[in-house]
């Protein structure tokens, strides 16, 4: 299964040529992760961050084509691996079925000591729903 989100390419996302300035993609991906944690895992970042966190430990991206101001992007979020305190993510960004960007990251659940700590059971259950079938 996957978590799908739609995001418009806004003026603030673009460089003077009218295409997404690539670091903005990473903000969009984080927005999708944050939405998933709030809407599906019932673990909103506003409640996580006073004591815990879900930092990105690794991030890789591949860009297939530019995205333009005014377009609507679909972002598909899934997991290729779920560990005790980490998750390996996969993102596919497209516009009208045409690939624009793919990315993989590793998210780590950390405690107040900023060391990895196991996912809470209800969060792990929600994350399991994102695991890709092998």
Predicted segments with their positions:
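Hot-dog-fold acyl-thioester-processing enzymes
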Residues: 1-56, 111-134
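HotDog/MaoC-like acyl-thioester-processing domains
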Residues: 3, 68-69, 80-134
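Conserved beta-strand segments that form the floor/walls of ligand-binding pockets within enzyme
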Residues: 20-21, 62, 74, 92, ...
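Hydrophobic beta-strand-centered segment that forms part of the acyl-chain substrate-binding groove
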Residues: 36-81, 87, 101-102, 108
């Amino acid at each position: 299964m996957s978590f799908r989100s739609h995001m418009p390419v806004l003026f603030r996302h673009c460089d003077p040529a009218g295409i997404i300035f690539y670091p903005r993609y990473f903000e969009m991906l984080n927005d999708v992760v944050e939405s998933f944690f709030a809407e599906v895992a019932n673990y909103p970042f506003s409640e996580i961050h006073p004591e815990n966190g879900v930092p990105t430990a690794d991030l890789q991206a591949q860009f297939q084509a530019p995205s333009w101001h005014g377009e609507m992007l679909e972002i598909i979020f899934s997991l290729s691996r779920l560990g005790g305190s980490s998750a390996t993510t996969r993102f596919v960004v497209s516009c009208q079925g045409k690939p624009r960007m793919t990315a993989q990251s590793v998210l780590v659940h950390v405690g107040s000591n900023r060391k990895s700590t196991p996912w809470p059971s209800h969060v792990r259950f929600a994350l399991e729903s994102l695991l890709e079938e092998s």
